[in-house]
């Protein structure tokens, strides 16, 4: 009797920290810092679906040459796609009302009332905002589709940048540009859609 009980218990202990979301796995706890570009995918899934905004800071570099232009471009792209942040999301991402109202008109560099600490928050918010274009079920199906070198990033002072393609159902959906940070973990320098979001079939 005791032996028969031990087996089910052992199998339960071996279940990873993922749950089914329409049949697809999404992390239920914050992933460990990414040791390689592919490790960022779980962070993206977790941030997009679980909305644990603290994880955004784990996967984003903090250098000015990333956060200033990155925040501007991410929010401009999200605006064009019609993706917005709710007041609750903005607050969770550390944006006060005045800052949240500026997301669609950010400068690409530091100005008097927009310093690097502000740009870091805006950049984190931009990452999450871009991810909102994908449904929870689609995130569950999202897979790694290859990694290539991004030589063009060098002209902006970013060395060693990699491009990770991700997608689902055989369709490449996004390119996630990333770089190894001083901590040894990988962080995201930019995200772009490789498909017309309005034409992307999602459940």
Put a short name on every predicted segment:
Residues 155:
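Active-site-flanking ligand-binding surface segments in enzyme catalytic domains
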Residues 1-9:
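Bacterial N-terminal signal peptides that target proteins for export
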Residues 129-151, 163-203:
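Short beta-strand edge/turn micro-motifs at domain boundaries
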Residues 21-53, 58, 65-72, 76-84:
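Short, low-complexity N-terminal intrinsically disordered segments enriched in polar/charged residues
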Residues 158-160:
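Proteolytic processing hotspots in large secreted/extracellular or virion-associated proteins
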Residues 58-152:
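Short solvent-exposed beta->alpha transition segments
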């Amino acid at each position: 009797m005791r032996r028969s009980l031990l087996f089910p218990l052992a199998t339960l202990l071996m279940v990873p920290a993922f749950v089914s979301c329409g049949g697809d796995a999404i992390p239920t706890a914050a992933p460990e810092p990414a040791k390689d570009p592919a490790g960022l995918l779980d962070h993206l899934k977790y941030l997009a679906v679980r909305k644990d905004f603290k994880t955004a800071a784990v996967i984003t570099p903090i250098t000015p040459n990333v956060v200033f232009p990155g925040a501007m471009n991410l929010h401009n792209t999200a605006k064009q796609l019609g993706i917005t942040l709710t007041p609750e999301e903005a607050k969770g991402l550390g944006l006060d009302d005045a800052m949240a109202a500026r997301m669609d008109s950010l400068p690409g560099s530091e100005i008097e009332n927009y310093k690097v600490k502000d740009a870091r928050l805006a950049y984190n918010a931009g990452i999450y905002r871009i991810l909102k274009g994908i449904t929870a079920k689609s995130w569950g199906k999202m897979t790694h589709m290859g990694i290539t070198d991004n030589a063009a990033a060098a002209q902006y002072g970013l060395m060693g940048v990699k491009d990770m393609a991700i997608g689902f159902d055989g369709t490449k959906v996004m390119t996630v540009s990333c770089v190894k940070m001083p901590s040894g973990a990988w962080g995201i320098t930019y995200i772009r859609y490789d498909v017309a979001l309005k034409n992307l079939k999602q459940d």
